Design a protein with these regions (language model features):
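A conserved acidic beta->alpha catalytic loop
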Residues: 24, 37-45, 86
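Conserved donor NDP-sugar-binding/catalytic core segment of glycosyltransferases
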Residues: 87, 91-121
Length: 275
């Protein structure tokens, strides 16, 4: 590998998925692997130590703070942020770095695909990615993993867990967008994501997203109307119509359900924290 890459993996209670994740990270031969364990109560840390000596255990922390802790600990300019449910193929890190350099981005997120489609929810999620996410180029909003970063950008901006402790993507990228002369977006590399087929896990994930959306609205009140439109109109109405027109029927149901659940928890969180 021409450039040295650090990999940061932030996890909590991920014993079921972490080993395969780290095997595939190791297969890509990064210069270092850093695992930030959010004080797991299972075998997460034990599994992490099989693949790296650089395991950081945090206490009374959150995902937003843990991401910055991992980034701060990295010794290289190029850092890949990988989560426990991501499944790399050999060469993915080099390809993701190529996307970063070719586009002169400070952050590039990969395209996404489902590691295994076991039911309509898995298929709907993958169809949604193909419709709305897997479009390479500069973007206004991206996710923070799986992604490649230039460490130097963190001289100008940091992950901030003040209020936004649950979901970090929206707050961080929104603040990044306000910096002059920065480019970020989606690359050509496609990385697999392993989600279970359990309906309750998807409901839990949508609730988690909605709580994060509510925190974002409290922190950035000027963006609240846009977020409300996103979850009350775009997700449950506009996205399903577009999905049906593109014959992505599973995506229509997936977006509708996600929009309703996220909107509910966004409202609950906004009202609770505003009280």
């Amino acid at each position: 590998m021409k450039y040295k890459i650090s990999v940061v993996v932030c996890v909590k209670n991920e014993e079921a998925r972490l080993e395969e994740c780290l095997k595939r990270v190791q297969m890509n031969e990064p210069d270092e692997i850093i695992v930030v364990d959010g004080d797991s109560s299972d075998r997460t840390a034990e599994i992490a130590y099989k693949y790296t000596d650089h395991v950081i255990t945090t206490h009374k922390s959150n995902l937003t703070r843990d991401r910055q802790i991992g980034l701060n600990a990295a010794r290289n300019e190029y850092i890949a942020m990988i989560d426990g449910d991501h499944r790399l193929e050999k060469g993915d890190l080099e390809l993701l770095l190529k996307d970063l350099l070719d586009n002169k981005f400070v952050i590039v997120q990969s395209q996404l695909k489902s590691f295994s489609n076991m039911n309509w929810m898995n298929r709907g999620e993958e169809q949604m990615w193909d419709l709305f996410h897997n479009i390479p180029g500069p973007k206004q909003m991206i996710g923070v993993a799986p992604a490649m970063y230039r460490k130097s950008i963190f001289e100008r901006i940091l992950f901030d867990d003040r209020i936004t402790k649950t979901i970090d993507d929206t707050d961080f990228i929104y603040r990044l967008s306000r910096l002059p002369d920065v480019r970020y977006g989606i690359g050509n590399t496609k990385i697999a994501q392993l989600h279970t087929d359990a309906y309750r896990d998807y409901i839990k994930k949508f609730k988690w997203y909605g709580i994060g959306d509510g925190e974002f609205c409290i922190k950035h009140r000027n963006r609240a109307p846009s977020m409300w439109f996103h979850l009350l109109i775009r997700y449950p109405l506009l996205y399903p119509v577009r999905a049906i027109l593109k014959r992505k029927i599973y995506a229509a149901g997936y977006c509708f359900l996600q929009g309703l659940i996220r909107a509910r928890w966004m409202v609950v969180t906004s009202m609770k924290k505003a009280a």
